[in-house]
């Protein structure tokens, strides 16, 4: 499957980096950097994911949120857990249905999973994969976006999205290459909100002013270093 292909690609990239120690390498990876020249990055947007969870937790009337993911790997798991923690902050009674479709792109399968969750009572969907928001539109429920902004394609459905800005990571790496300071490092922190690597977008017309204000207050605390979002890379599961 795709995960094994990716692992094979990474092994090859690490071997090439070892063969060319004077060339800078930067790769998206859940694993560690290797001196002197192999650096890694990842989509550490758990902070805006937490904030989007606050939006969802306040929005659900059934207290059941559906979550459809691709693969249960660290960079997906941590965003889901952060989202769940944010939802629980504003709604301690909220429960979750979680499913992974074991594919990066299979909209029909994601849509089918989302429909099953809605049939079980979920009235807000976490759209980690394409297809979930389409299901939400058909059933008239709200959705939360992830990584990229697709709200323009689903007006009135996507309440908020946790957005990844990879440019912050790339810019830092390129600047270090340019000034000769590049070395093996983990560039994960440059996906944090404080570095401009992650952000939250909200459609405030789809939520109460109280919810929007609470989310903005928490966001300010994150940016000021007064609130830290927990990181949990373990596979999330449905509530019993």
Give the role of each language-model region.
Residues 102-118:
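Structural motif
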Residues 178-240:
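Hinge/cleft segment of the Venus flytrap/periplasmic-binding protein
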Residues 3-4:
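Short, small-residue-biased leader/transition segments that mark boundaries at the very start
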Residues 51-94, 98, 186-207:
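An alpha-beta-alpha
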Residues 18-43, 147-157:
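Flexible loop/hinge segments that line or gate small-molecule binding clefts
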Residues 148, 153-196, 200:
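Flexible loop/turn connectors
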Residues 113-162:
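Pocket-lining segment of extracytoplasmic ligand-binding domains
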Residues 33-58, 67-72, 155-168:
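Short beta-strand elements at the ligand-binding edges of bilobed clamshell
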């Amino acid at each position: 499957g795709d995960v094994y292909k990716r692992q094979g690609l990474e092994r090859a990239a690490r071997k090439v980096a070892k063969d060319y120690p004077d060339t800078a390498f930067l790769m998206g990876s859940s694993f560690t950097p290797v001196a002197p020249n192999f650096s890694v990055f990842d989509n550490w947007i758990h902070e805006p994911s937490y904030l989007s969870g606050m939006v969802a937790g306040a929005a659900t009337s059934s207290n059941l949120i559906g979550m459809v993911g691709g693969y249960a790997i660290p960079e997906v798991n941590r965003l889901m857990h952060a989202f769940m923690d944010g939802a629980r902050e504003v709604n301690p009674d909220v429960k979750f249905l979680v499913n992974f479709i074991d594919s990066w792109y299979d909209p029909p399968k994601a849509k089918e999973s989302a429909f099953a969750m809605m049939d079980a009572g979920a009235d807000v969907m976490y759209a980690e994969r394409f297809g979930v928001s389409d299901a939400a539109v058909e059933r008239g429920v709200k959705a939360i976006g992830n990584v990229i902004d697709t709200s323009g394609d689903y007006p009135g459905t996507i309440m908020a999205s946790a957005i990844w800005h990879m440019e912050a990571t790339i810019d830092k790496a390129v600047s270090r290459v340019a000034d000769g300071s590049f070395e093996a490092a983990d560039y994960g922190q440059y996906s944090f909100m404080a570095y401009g690597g992650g952000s939250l977008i909200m459609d405030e017309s789809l939520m109460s002013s109280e919810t929007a204000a609470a989310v903005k207050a928490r966001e300010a605390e994150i940016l000021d270093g007064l609130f830290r979002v927990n990181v949990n890379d373990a596979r999330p599961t449905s509530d019993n």
